[in-house]
């Protein structure tokens, strides 16, 4: 097994859940590299489906996506469609399956809508050097987000000794420890986990924040010093703030009121 498998688990699998952006405002490129920041079907004038999508859960969540340089020290990009693996992950331990599902491209249960972004360390911040990760923001049916959060937390507690998982494409990944670590004090509830890889030095990190029926999930690994791998609190705070603003009917912009979201700067 190589480090590429670990990176694929964090970066590749989570991109397959759909609903990724068609492009950042102002960068002039779409996911397919075309000019104008629009996907080909949008450029072709598919106004009806686009309007319906904008009014649905995924359309609302798109307004909560972070812009490219919105968080200092990080570059945030769209998650291009078609770059992730397919299929459902598995685990040798049923109790650990929620962790494998969280890392997979097909969340269980399927959310009403999702948007996915990638992030990477940038600039001169040594603590973020080599950092790679994804953000997945998903809206669920009433009660489902809380249930997913609970199952994930319970799985982490049951699988402290590690577990084996198989990606949807059949790649094997072995974790020799799962640790519940300090989580940012955000949203209705939050949790964070550190998964130690049995072969690679770089850990896989997961942070999840629930705000009502929306889960904001963050996945990260690193290509540098494994002891420095982190999911920056300022990234989590910024994303949760925008998700809360959109839930309250805002646009997700800086001017939207997110008071009461429990957000803290870190």
Please provide the spans of the model-predicted regions.
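Short glycine/proline-enriched loop/turn "hinge" motifs that connect secondary-structure elements
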Residues: 126-127, 207-211
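Short, well-ordered beta-strand elements
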Residues: 133-136, 213-222
